[in-house]
């Protein structure tokens, strides 16, 4: 997920979607959220997309299985696993915000950051964590 900055030709989501497809990740495992402008919005909008896709998938599956005489377990017994692909310095905050908005089974998948800029990113991220904790996003 991720919107488009003023100096960017494509949304972050679109760029990552194309990258994941080029690496062989199938369409059914990807969702495209291009509206967010912050990590908090990323998680809120992504949760909405995941919830809607899962509702449609389960309704379709429930109907098909009912025709065969099978039942699905109740929705509350289904656990949806979500992976957050982000920078190594950003993983802690992204997972914390995801949990706060109700994405409980979340795993971080972190990419290594530029070692020259890593300290700068970590300092900036510390302030972002403090801000998100203060406003209740984490």
Task: Please report, for each region that a protein language model flagged, where it lies by residue.
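A structural signal for short, hydrophobic/glycine-enriched beta-strand patches
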Residues: 1-124
């Amino acid at each position: 997920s991720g919107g488009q900055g003023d100096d960017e030709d494509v949304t972050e989501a679109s760029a990552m979607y194309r990258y994941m497809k080029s690496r062989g990740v199938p369409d059914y495992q990807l969702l495209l959220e291009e509206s967010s402008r912050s990590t908090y919005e990323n998680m809120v909008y992504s949760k909405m997309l995941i919830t809607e896709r899962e509702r449609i998938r389960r309704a379709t599956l429930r109907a098909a299985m009912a025709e065969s005489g099978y039942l699905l377990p109740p929705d509350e017994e289904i656990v949806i696993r979500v992976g957050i692909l982000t920078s190594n310095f950003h993983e802690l905050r992204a997972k914390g915000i995801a949990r706060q908005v109700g994405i409980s089974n979340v795993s971080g998948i972190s990419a290594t950051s530029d070692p020259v800029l890593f300290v700068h990113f970590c300092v900036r991220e510390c302030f972002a964590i403090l801000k998100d904790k203060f406003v209740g996003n984490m």
